[in-house]
Every structure is written in C-alpha cells, then in structure tokens.
Amino acid sequence: MTVPTPYEDLLRLVMDTGTPKADRTGTGTKSVFGHQMRWNLADGFPLITTKKVHLKSIVYELLWFLRGDSNVKWLQDNGVTIWDEWADADGELGPVYGVQWRSWPTPSGEHIDQITQTIETLKSNPDSRRIIVSAWNVGDIPQMALAPCHAFFQFYVADGKLSCQLYQRSADLFLGVPFNIASYALLTHMVAQQAGLEPGDFIWTGGDCHIYDNHVDQVTEQLSREPLPYPTLKLNKRESIFDYTFEDVEIVDYRHHPAIKAPVAV
C-alpha cells in the first residue's frame, strides 16, 4: 500500500525552494506562500508517523477550545503545557480561539456560539455555503496573547459525508502543523458524528508555510525516515459535541518513528 505523504512533501518543498525571511520571533525562516494538502479520513487518521506526535496535547487542546476557555489552568491540570509560554501571570491568554469559537462578540453586546450554530446548520441546511467558524476577530486581536494561526474553517457536505477545510495563515511546519492536522481531523470526526454524517476529507490550506532556521536539522532528520501507514480513530459518541472527554478518543495502530525535539519560537 502506498502511504500518502502530503506533509512530508511540503517539508521537502520548503527545504528545497523556500525563500529566506525574517519573522516576528527574530529566529528566521524558509518560507513558501500558499499550499494545500488533502486527506480522505476514510483512509486513516492523519497523525504524522515520521516522528512521534504527542496525541494527549492535541486532544486536550481541542477540548479546551470547545470549552470556550482562555486560561491555561485547565490544560495544566490535565498535564498539557503547550500554551504556557504565551500566558500571563494569571494564566490568561485573552480572547483566543475558544472564546471566538464559542462566544464571538456582536456590536449589540450579545455573543455567537459558532460551534453550536455550525452543527445546527449542518442538520437543517447542509448545502449552505456559510458553514464557517472564524477565530480571526480583527477587533480582538490586540488583546490576544497570540493572533490566531489557524484562523478560519469551513464545512461542506456531499453524499452524506462531511469535509472540512482549514485556512492557516501562519504555519510552523515542523512543530505546529502536525498538531493542527490531527486536531482538525479529530474535530471533523466529532462534528460529523454530531450531525449524523460520515467523515469525508480534511483539507489544509496554508498561507505563510515556513520552517524555522533552528528546525532545519530536525526536518532533515525527519525527511530521512520512511513514512508508515496512518492509524485509525475510534471515537465514542456523546450527546453533545461539548461532552467529549479525552477517554472518548482512541487512536489504533499508531506506528511512528521516535520524537524529535526542537525549540519553540515565541
């Protein structure tokens, strides 16, 4: 069986053709602009195999987004520290992803729960072209500890299958993107389950797709490894998308190469 390698192909493309660029963190990158990857979720769960990816952090982060939370305490209580570098002394991050997903502020002072709205629309009007969730709230960005990197996603229904396309304006290919791929693939499974649909495709669209200069050695090592078949996902069904727990998510037959450590650009 041929193993799909869209992620590794993108790493190779950026290594071979990327433009050297300065960046907000002062680290420096190789970058390409505009790229798309696609996975058929019926063919396996897209958890990268050329290095071990920390599934616990991915699942808890997604559940944290779905809680509408903006404080790292719940993550820390569950052993996840991936947001600690950006939090203030009280653990606050400002109106980041979960806040925008669950309580987007309106000019009238009300709030929109985009996730609830999305699932309701998928059930009542699945052919709508407006089934979109945005974390990119221009008015709130100055109050965010970090502007949304994965900013906007859209759902699409065809033949009883739910597909999701994510737009990621800034893509840290070595550290961040493997998390983002798995997170949104899992979210697609959850939303499909709640809407009575089968999972379709997950499409990842990247804007500034970059490899940090201090990740080049790690990427070189990763690309020397043979990709392995993707695992599969078993997801317990819950009454509501907000009821899922870590224990409801089981990844089966995740075969992978060893983890590769690298510094985070803050």
Swiss-Prot record:
Name of protein: Thymidylate synthase
Reaction(s) catalysed (UniProt annotation): dUMP + (6R)-5,10-methylene-5,6,7,8-tetrahydrofolate = 7,8-dihydrofolate + dTMP
One function term, GO molecular function aspect: thymidylate synthase activity
This protein's GO CC annotations: cytosol
Function: Catalyzes the reductive methylation of 2'-deoxyuridine-5'-monophosphate (dUMP) to 2'-deoxythymidine-5'-monophosphate (dTMP) while utilizing 5,10-methylenetetrahydrofolate (mTHF) as the methyl donor and reductant in the reaction, yielding dihydrofolate (DHF) as a by-product. This enzymatic reaction provides an intracellular de novo source of dTMP, an essential precursor for DNA biosynthesis.
Coiled-coil segments on the chain, per record: none
Residues involved in dUMP binding: 24, 129-130, 169-172, 180, 210-212
Entry keywords, A to Z: Cytoplasm, Methyltransferase, Nucleotide biosynthesis, Transferase
Catalytic activity, EC: 2.1.1.45
Gene3D superfamilies associated with the record: Thymidylate synthase/dCMP hydroxymethylase domain (3.30.572.10)
Quaternary organization: Homodimer.
Subcellular location(s) per record: Cytoplasm
Main location class: cytoplasm
Gene of this entry: thyA
Protein family per UniProt: Belongs to the thymidylate synthase family. Bacterial-type ThyA subfamily.
Active site annotation, chain numbering: 149 (nucleophile)
Pfam families to which the protein is assigned, alphabetical: Thymidylat_synt
Gene Ontology biological process terms, A to Z: dTMP biosynthetic process; dTTP biosynthetic process; methylation
The protein's annotated pathway: Pyrimidine metabolism; dTTP biosynthesis
Enzyme class: transferase
Binding locations of (6R)-5,10-methylene-5,6,7,8-tetrahydrofolate: 54, 172, 265
